[in-house]
Amino acid sequence: MKTYILAGVAAGALIVMSTPVLAADAAHGQELFRGQCGICHQGGEGDGDGGQGPSLRGVVGRKVGGDPNFAYTQVLSDAKDKWTTDSLSTFLADPNKAMPGTAMPISVKNDADRADIIAYLASLKASQ
């Protein structure tokens, strides 16, 4: 009897350990983008006109400060890295801590909301 109980506990633990973390919700990220980001940034079709900040179409994988149609602050212009989902998360959590001197005034403190916005941004291609 004890063997069956232990086997059941072990199997349950294995299932829990192998269950992937829930994926970010790009559709929710689009809603958040439209409400929080689209005032300053362009995203996908219908997300807003932006214009005060760089276009975020194709931002994942793009050089930091790499939108040729935007005049970045020096800290972003001088950056050599490319935007990844991790670097975007760090930046959006606290832009001025991540890159002191940035003009980005808004942060996204909620981890799930930030992940959703980044999932949405990752879905956008530069040509959209």
Where do the model's predicted regions map?
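Histidine-centered phosphotransfer motif of kinases
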Residues: 120
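Bacterial N-terminal signal peptides that target proteins for export
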Residues: 1-9
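Acidic/polar helix N-cap motif
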Residues: 25, 110-113
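Periplasmic/extracellular electron-transfer cofactor-ligation site
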Residues: 24-72, 76-82, 90-102, 124-128
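N-terminal signal peptide c-region/cleavage motif recognized by signal peptidases
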Residues: 18-19, 24
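Thiol/disulfide oxidoreductase modules built on the thioredoxin-like
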Residues: 102-110
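Bacterial N-terminal signal peptides
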Residues: 8-17
